[in-house]
Amino acid sequence: MSFVGENSGVKMGSEDWEKDEPQCCLEDPAGSPLEPGPSLPTMNFVHTSPKVKNLNPKKFSIHDQDHKVLVLDSGNLIAVPDKNYIRPEIFFALASSLSSASAEKGSPILLGVSKGEFCLYCDKDKGQSHPSLQLKKEKLMKLAAQKESARRPFIFYRAQVGSWNMLESAAHPGWFICTSCNCNEPVGVTDKFENRKHIEFSFQPVCKAEMSPSEVSD
């Protein structure tokens, strides 16, 4: 999965989001690799109106069943072996309203990366018969305020299976975010449950994460 859209080489702002919040872990200000911490209780998302502006995104790293972690490398979201020197990508999850939401499928959420500057998106490219997973330059907090028709390709149902989570596209039911059994391959989507694809993930909360000031709504 790679960046799409105009100005894909966008540069991140130099300022960090300074919103006060409890610090239950330490971060190296120099940006040293993060070490995944122990599994914590799974977050509970609620159906929330997209007009709510004071809702803070949940922050976590994502790990698959093969002990791989998702990282962002040169605009590509890939799964690599979870080593101490690897810095996982920090995902920002925000509850999203959906008129046709099904409680059986899970909680609808939006997923952002790169400090909330890019969002995960599942849709079909022109001429393609199957959807693909992409990163689009959409600010997470602004996306949350858009109409449902514009948000739908960005919405994923988060279903909890014990301590694991599955992410199903709201725009393309039956298609789940997946990783390959091989290392260093792009994250994608699949509609097939097979041994060579992992669709269940562990979400490990991050206590404090950077986010561009422009992403914070008053």
Swiss-Prot record:
Keywords: Cytokine, Cytoplasm, Disease variant, Nucleus, Secreted
A GO-annotated cellular component: extracellular region
Gene Ontology terms for molecular function: cytokine activity; identical protein binding; interleukin-1 receptor binding
CDD domains, A to Z: beta-trefoil_IL37
Subcellular localization, as worded in the UniProt entry: Cytoplasm, Cytosol; Nucleus; Secreted
GO biological process terms held by the UniProt record: cellular response to lipopolysaccharide; cytokine-mediated signaling pathway; immune response; inflammatory response; negative regulation of interleukin-6 production; negative regulation of tumor necrosis factor production; regulation of inflammatory response
Ranges for region Disordered: 1-40
Keyword Secreted appears in the UniProt entry: yes
Domain of life: Eukaryota
Subunit field text: Interacts with SMAD3. Binds IL18R1, but not to IL1R1, with lower affinity than IL18, and does not seem to act as a receptor antagonist for IL18. Interacts with cargo receptor TMED10; the interaction mediates the translocation from the cytoplasm into the ERGIC (endoplasmic reticulum-Golgi intermediate compartment) and thereby secretion.
The family this protein is said to belong to: Belongs to the IL-1 family.
Disease involvement: Inflammatory bowel disease 31, autosomal recessive: A form of inflammatory bowel disease, a chronic, relapsing inflammation of the gastrointestinal tract with a complex etiology and a multifactorial inheritance pattern. It is subdivided into Crohn disease and ulcerative colitis phenotypes. Crohn disease may affect any part of the gastrointestinal tract from the mouth to the anus, but most frequently it involves the terminal ileum and colon. Bowel inflammation is transmural and discontinuous; it may contain granulomas or be associated with intestinal or perianal fistulas.
Protein name according to UniProt: Interleukin-37
Native source organism of the sequence: Homo sapiens (Human)
